[in-house]
Amino acid sequence: MRVLENVQPQKVFYYFEELAWIPHGSYHTKAISDYCMNFAKERELEAYQDAYNNVVIIKEATAGYESAEPIILQGHLDMVCEKENDTEIDFENEGLRLFIDGDFVKAKGTTLGGDDGIAIAYALAILDSDEIAHPRLECVFTVDEEVGMLGAEKIDLSMLKGHQVLNIDSDVEGTFLTSCAGGVTAECSFPLVFDEAEGLQYRLTLTGLMGGHSGGEIDKERANAIVEIGRILKHLDDTLEMGKIGRASCR
């Protein structure tokens, strides 16, 4: 029995649940990419899949909209895979366990994958409909967005005719953004020399912070565990020898 069969828009959440059953964390998008390609093949839609698992699906305009400007619908196939400490799940081989909590759709003990599964679900629902009038639709599904826009960097979009892009990757209903938070990833290498440590050893762990997303909460001045650990270390005795600094799995 489907969990979301009575959630509206029904067709959108039908596809969202379909996608939730397919493991699709970053770097593991082959299965969900193949699902989208099979979807297109069953409906005889023009579709492309590259070696990186990016997918483009094209549906020609309905009657009366042949001369209208094509619309590009864009979302990403990968999700952030995080779980609660007491949850057992193999994200590479198991789908999500959805449930309804009041007005919210949630996943048991894990992230939901709404970012950006809902975008793919919207696009598939529109592509599947015979009742929605539309210009030529060009649906672009990229991979590994959560780890650095890797799919977007590699994708070939030479088959597209549209110039108007709707990127479906925001979290506020009814709000349209014409901006981007941006992001920078720095990889640094330093020459290190390891010696046997003497004296007492201590583990310092900082947890329980509110957290947040730099795209939406960067101005809230919330504590960042990495920054705060750095401040603590800066004020400790200079004779302290550091062994290792680590952080959680999410950036």
Summary of predicted features, one role per range:
Residues 2-103:
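Acidic/His- and Gly-rich active-site-bordering loop/insert found
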Residues 20, 40, 44, 81, ...:
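Structural signal for hydrophobic packing residues in well-ordered secondary-structure cores
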Residues 23, 95-97, 101-106, 110, ...:
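Midchain, well-structured core segments that form catalytic/ion-binding scaffolds
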Residues 36, 40, 120-127, 155, ...:
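Buried hydrophobic packing segments
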Residues 65-147, 152-154, 159-163, 201:
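Active-site metal-coordination/substrate-binding segment of hydrolases
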